[in-house]
């Protein structure tokens, strides 16, 4: 899988970063033009009720390890559906440890400090690689702000340039 990931990233970089003159009719945009970045909830405010199995909470730790486990917090399964994460969802940790990944760890609730990244207009690979393209810049921004936990702000997404089809 790592080899496939590297090949896909190399193709993306070749066509969308290094050789943009070959794109044809494309225009400049920013990350928020191609995707919605939904911030998670403070899940401690939505605990699983007594006698409710609830859902595991997706936090930065779980994203980094690729799964929830028996030590993961649990939240109510009655949270708004947009905060319930399923396999195949792009998740972007924007605070603390910054990373972008496609979640494959099962159904869970989206915690604060994580964005659910989705688009009704563009394919998932397109949104994923543009977000990932800006990750090192976001890490530098967060490091410069690190008093307690370094983070980026929504305005950083709003100025991160992308190429989009005309």
What role is predicted for each listed range?
Residues 1-42, 63-66, 163-166:
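Non-catalytic DNA-recognition/assembly elements of restriction-modification systems
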Residues 30-38, 64-66, 103-107, 112-164:
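Basic, amphipathic alpha-helical recognition segments used for DNA target recognition
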Residues 32-47, 54-87, 104-105, 109-110:
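Sequence-specific dsDNA recognition surfaces
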Residues 91-93:
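A generic structural signal for residues embedded in beta-strands
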